[in-house]
């Protein structure tokens, strides 16, 4: 219902045509996602199904910016990688019915690309945590953890500031180094136990969907191949002879594709450095950067509509157009504020307001700081066009953010 009920959906800049479609297409896309996901699980027409799964899942994520999560971005990337892997080479319907040659082994690049992607997610999340709020003020965990103090056994500990500091520092070191311990055979199983504990705990404390489960199962890919082979032998019988021949050797085009993909993944998260100001405040270059659960922000955005000819002014009830979730997310994200301002301009113009002037009185609090003005209230947002350049109409935070 989150894609059906709201009167307005926030598009990604440059991808406005992918904003939430008509209801029949919404249902059709979800049905396609379900069917293709089942096909991938069973290994049925794997190549087609994996592509359909990637396209449908990613298409759904592009419907509305307000539902963006790093975790969904990660799932899209893993789904994209899966499209190119020979994951149906064994224990699949494709192999059973000889649509593909069963493979007893695969080349290292099929593991390497997954390892790199997992490593980037973890390490970049760790780098993002190297900031004063996270390490020296234990924020936002100092705000979030006490809310779970009623939990049995561990609950009372969560009420202490000391626990927030322990979680903050451990979280940083975990993200920075867990990939190294997973790669090292001598520490792999201890690391896996840590992964299970860490993600189980975060899944319990925070509403982050399937991400903990995804990362726990992803960690099993670091196990020695003999373990996976034993599992295959125990649960799946091979009806056909497996080939030792490498059918998936990586040629020059493949090397270029993988290299380009990795380079992009390494560089893209740092685009925030191209913008002035603190990116945690301005949100510029913030998405797609693995800054996972790094800030606690909330805001209030009161839009004001002024008739350009008569000067008559009115206030907007955001909930008339947006869901509670959309309004919450929009209140501290400037590109969403701008998109909604343009929507309001068009809607009120239809209602007879002459070329409406759209301004906003927006205040935001971040990591427990006092609320501060977020948007220049003198700017007519209906005349501002979005771009990848710096948004000069974002107000600077009056305090110091490190």
Residue ranges and their predicted role:
Residues 1-402:
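Alpha-helical membrane-anchoring segments
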């Amino acid at each position: 219902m989150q894609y059906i009920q709201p009167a307005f959906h926030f598009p990604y800049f440059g991808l406005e045509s992918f904003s939430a479609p008509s209801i029949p297409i919404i249902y059709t896309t979800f049905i396609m996602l379900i069917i293709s996901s089942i096909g991938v699980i069973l290994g049925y027409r794997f190549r087609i199904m994996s592509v359909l799964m990637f396209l449908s899942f990613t298409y759904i994520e592009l419907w509305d910016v307000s539902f963006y999560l790093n975790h969904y971005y990660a799932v899209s990337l893993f789904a994209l990688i899966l499209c190119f892997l020979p994951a149906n080479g064994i224990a699949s319907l494709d192999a059973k019915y000889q649509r593909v040659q069963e493979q007893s082994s695969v080349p290292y690049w099929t593991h390497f690309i997954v390892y790199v992607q997992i490593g980037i997610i973890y390490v970049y999340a760790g780098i993002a945590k190297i900031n004063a709020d996270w390490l020296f003020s234990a924020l936002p965990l100092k705000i979030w953890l006490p809310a779970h103090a009623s939990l049995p056994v561990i609950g009372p500990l969560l009420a202490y500031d000391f626990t927030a500091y322990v979680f903050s520092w451990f979280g940083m070191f975990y993200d920075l180094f867990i990939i190294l311990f997973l790669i090292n055979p001598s520490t792999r199983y201890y690391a896996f136990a840590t992964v299970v504990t860490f993600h189980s705990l975060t899944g319990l404390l925070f509403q982050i969907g399937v991400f903990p489960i995804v990362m726990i199962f992803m960690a099993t890919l670091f196990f020695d191949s003999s373990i996976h082979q034993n599992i295959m032998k125990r649960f799946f019988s091979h009806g056909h002879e497996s080939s030792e021949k490498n059918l998936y050797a990586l040629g020059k085009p493949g090397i270029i594709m993988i290299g380009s993909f990795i380079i992009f993944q390494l560089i893209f998260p740092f685009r925030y450095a191209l913008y002035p100001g603190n990116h945690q405040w301005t949100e510029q270059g913030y998405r797609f950067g693995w800054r996972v659960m790094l800030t606690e922000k909330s805001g209030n955005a009161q839009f004001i509509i002024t008739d350009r000819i008569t000067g008559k002014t009115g206030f907007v009830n955001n909930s008339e157009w947006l869901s509670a979730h959309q309004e919450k997310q929009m209140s501290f994200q400037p590109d969403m504020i701008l998109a909604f301002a343009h929507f309001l301009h068009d809607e009120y113009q239809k209602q007879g307001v002459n070329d409406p002037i759209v301004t906003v009185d927006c205040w935001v609090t971040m990591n427990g700081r006092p609320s501060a003005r977020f948007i220049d209230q003198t700017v007519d947002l209906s005349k501002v066009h979005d771009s990848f350049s710096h948004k000069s109409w974002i107000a600077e935070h009056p305090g110091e953010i490190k």
